[in-house]
């Protein structure tokens, strides 16, 4: 027998796979936070657990939000459910890669230093590309939902558009920079997020966003998480 609070939650957050990924992300974030406090190892000048913690929190917000939005899907429900399942599964793949590499003291993003690292990076890039496509399709299922008020529907449309654009900014970070492919500068890295300077300079605490140059991660973050704010 469900309690009243459990019943309300099951009505609000209706996609089982997205709920499962949200719970897994929450548990993972709590573990990463604990390790962040007690594991002194560093990678690129910060705790090895900083990146996993950020991505786990982001995945928690993302999956919980889309589980809530799924409750407003009023057409092609089975197909929308399939897209939600795909998002949930591939985010788990992405998170496992990030957490696994960090726990070994290795970078995940932009790392092409060996066939193994290229494989991990390619897997991550493929997974998140499919997540983008599945999010777009799920968003189309919500576009004309009659289960929302007119104002909420308009807010969700704007939020989806901005979130998809924000997610898309990540793709602009992946091409190798000219200096990275010069033989004398080769360091096994292909891609960057800083504009006008090399990655790894001074940045904001925890977020790491550059304080000396442009940083594509800022627009990526605020674009992606507009879906939690606008509706």
Predicted regions and their residues:
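Membrane-interfacial catalytic/cofactor-binding modules of polytopic membrane enzymes
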Residues: 175-226
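Short, Lys/Arg-rich, polar N-terminal cytosolic tail immediately upstream
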Residues: 1-14
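Hydrophobic, aromatic-enriched interface-forming segments
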Residues: 131-190
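Membrane-interfacial loop-to-helix junctions in multi-pass inner-membrane proteins
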Residues: 12-15, 77-88, 149-156
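Helix-boundary and loop/linker segments of multi-pass membrane transporters
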Residues: 10-11, 113, 206-211
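Internal, conserved structured core segments that host functional sites
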Residues: 109-147
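Hydrophobic cores of alpha-helical transmembrane segments in multi-pass integral membrane proteins
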Residues: 17-37, 49-72, 84-103, 123-138, ...
């Amino acid at each position: 027998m469900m309690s009243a609070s459990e019943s309300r939650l099951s009505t609000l957050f209706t996609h089982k796979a997205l709920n499962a990924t949200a719970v897994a992300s929450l548990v993972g974030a709590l573990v990463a936070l604990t390790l962040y406090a007690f594991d002194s190892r560093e990678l690129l000048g910060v705790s090895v657990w900083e990146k996993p913690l950020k991505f786990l929190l982001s995945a928690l917000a993302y999956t919980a939000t889309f589980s809530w939005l799924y409750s407003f899907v009023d057409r092609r429900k089975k197909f929308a459910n399939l897209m939600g399942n795909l998002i949930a599964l591939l985010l788990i793949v992405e998170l496992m890669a990030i957490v696994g590499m960090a726990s070994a003291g290795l970078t995940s993003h932009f790392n092409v230093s060996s066939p193994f690292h290229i494989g991990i990076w390619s897997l991550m890039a493929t997974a998140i590309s499919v997540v983008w496509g599945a999010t777009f399709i799920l968003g189309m299922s919500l576009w004309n939902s009659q289960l929302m008020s007119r104002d909420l529907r308009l807010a969700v449309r704007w939020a989806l558009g901005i979130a998809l654009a924000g997610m898309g900014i990540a793709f602009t970070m992946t091409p190798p920079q000219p200096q990275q492919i010069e033989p004398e500068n080769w360091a096994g890295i292909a891609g960057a997020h800083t504009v006008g300077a090399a990655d790894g300079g001074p940045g904001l605490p925890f977020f790491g966003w550059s304080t000396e140059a442009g940083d594509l991660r800022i627009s990526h973050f605020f674009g992606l998480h507009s879906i939690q704010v606008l509706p």
